[in-house]
UniProtKB/Swiss-Prot annotation:
GO MF assignments: ATP binding; cysteine-tRNA ligase activity; zinc ion binding
Recorded superkingdom: Bacteria
Lineage: Bacteria, Bacillati, Bacillota, Bacilli, Bacillales
Coiled coil start-end: none
Pfam families the UniProt entry points to: DALR_2, tRNA-synt_1e
Name of encoding gene: cysS
Cellular compartments annotated: Cytoplasm
Any single GO CC term annotated in Swiss-Prot or TrEMBL for this entry: cytosol
Full protein name: Cysteine--tRNA ligase
Sequence motif 'KMSKS' region, residues: 266-270
Enzyme Commission designation: 6.1.1.16
Residues annotated as signal peptide: none
Length: 465
């Protein structure tokens, strides 16, 4: 089975064929580290970590690079407001980023380059563009000359004349064309700066990724990925810079994930409806958040609400409960061989369907459907009077493998005796208040955690299943 990827560049699904056999070069745009990331910022790391995990599962050696922009207008503004220097703020939020995405199940990239640690190659890249006539200096700034790059607009699929007409920035004294963009910005008084052939300053945003991608992955990479909002102008400008310099294709497959809405409204700081990962992982299990994010195809928008999160949690708990029941039954199973082939053949079908979903542009939504199928099938098997260790182990291994591909964990924390007693007391109060819906919900939730309740004349007794 071959993998097909929807390529933003061609607007169609294409068979994935890496430049080098069994090797994948992948670049994912990382955050500007001036604050904690919100859940919209967290979607790309989770999505493309899953892509990476699946490629590795299929036998590819994935070189995965994701950068940190640690000098930027937003960082400078934050430094001025807080009375701290830019490096201090950047270091703090790099650490916070790692804490957040690690909690969400993301592995570290092969390399996490920082702009400030690669200033020499960025300046060299800009100088080469100037030498080739693709860039020009203007009063200490350096701009990319878009009209010189014939393919400008090919990622956003817009003619350059239309892009120029819709450009927000008018031609100023420094720029020759509205679409020209900054490669180097002259430092303002009091700003952090680096020495360059054009004076003191710092790089523009777009050039940073081009330079670091080239340094760590070469002139042409297999997959370049990021949020949908980066397609234009960021990724469009990366293509222009890189291909103008090398004359080679910059990236062969472009992947972009969709937006996140909050309660059916677009998430934005202006509306004040954004949710920081730093906060939400204190309210909800980070694994649930990842499972929720992967329950929707990465190119589609996600509507984020507590109701949907709770519904997703119920599904995740069903799978975890099935897994726990399998592990528990393993001890009492035998080497029974009757009917083994039938159950194992069904498991093979689920595995194939899971891989077919992932091969189809990493459709995690359909892949998760197969997790539910495995769990339901396992529950049916556990109704058998006699169960086989071979089949039980196959179920357990399959669930563990598929969860690992998605960056998820199956371990379910065991409830403490005191927690169980507290829930039973809450159920007793609910029954006194004739809130039978809540009473039943508590009983069912405990059952899902392998806690069996028995109501007697002497009170409610419980035992672990």
């Amino acid at each position: 089975m071959t993998i097909h990827i929807y390529n933003t560049l061609t607007r169609q699904k294409e068979e994935f064929i890496p430049l080098e056999e069994n090797k994948v070069k992948m670049y994912v745009c990382g955050p500007t580290v001036y604050n904690y990331i919100h859940i919209g910022n967290a979607r790309p790391p989770m999505v493309f970590d899953t892509v990476r995990r699946y490629l590795e599962y299929k036998g590819y050696d994935v070189q995965y690079v994701s950068n940190f922009t640690d000098v930027d207008d937003k960082l400078i503004k934050a430094a001025n407001e807080l009375g701290e220097d830019v490096p201090t703020i950047a270091d703090r939020f790099v650490e916070a980023y790692f804490e957040d995405v690690t909690a969400l199940g993301c592995k570290h990239a092969t390399v996490h380059p920082r702009v400030t640690e690669n200033m020499d190659i960025i300046i060299e890249f800009i100088q080469e563009l100037v030498n080739k006539g693709y860039a020009y200096e203007s009063e200490g700034d350096v701009y990319f000359r878009t009209k010189e790059f014939e393919g400008y607009g090919k990622l956003s699929h817009q003619p350059i004349a239309d892009l120029r007409h819709g450009a927000r920035i008018e031609v100023g004294e420094k720029k020759q064309d509205p679409l020209d963009f900054a490669l180097w910005k002259a430092a303002k008084e009091g700003e952090i700066f680096w020495e360059s052939p054009w004076g003191q300053g710092r790089p523009g945003w777009h050039i940073e990724c081009s330079a670091m991608a080239r340094k760590y992955l070469g002139d042409t990479i297999d997959i370049h990925a990021g949020g949908q909002d980066l397609a234009f102008p960021h990724h469009e400008n990366e293509i222009a810079q890189s291909e103008a310099l090398t004359g080679k294709t910059f990236a062969r497959y472009w992947m972009h994930n969709g937006y996140i809405n909050i309660n059916n409204e677009k998430m934005s700081k202006s509306l004040g409806n954004f949710i920081l990962v730093h906060d939400i992982i204190k309210q909800y299990d980070p694994q649930l958040i990842r499972f929720f994010m992967l329950s929707v195809h990465y190119r589609h928008p996600i509507n984020f609400s507590e109701e949907l999160l709770q519904s997703t949690n119920n599904g995740l708990e069903r799978i975890k409960t099935a897994y726990g029941n399998l592990k528990h039954r393993m001890e009492s199973s035998t080497d029974l061989t009757d009917h083994n082939e039938k159950w194992l053949a069904d498991l093979e079908k689920f595995q194939t369907a899971f891989e077919e979903a992932m091969n189809d542009d990493f459709n995690t939504a359909n892949a998760i459907t197969e997790l539910y199928n495995v769990a339901n099938h396992a529950n049916q098997y556990l109704l058998e009077e006699h169960t086989s260790t071979v089949v039980i182990e196959a179920y357990v291994k399959q669930l563990e493998t598929l969860f690992d591909i998605l960056g998820l964990e199956l371990a379910q924390e065991e409830l403490l005796d005191e927690e169980i007693e507290a829930l039973i007391q809450k159920r007793i109060e609910a029954r006194k208040n004739r809130d039978f819906a809540l009473s039943d919900q508590i009983r069912d939730d405990l059952k899902d955690r392998n806690i069996i309740l028995e109501d007697t004349a002497q009170g409610t007794r419980w035992k672990r299943g």
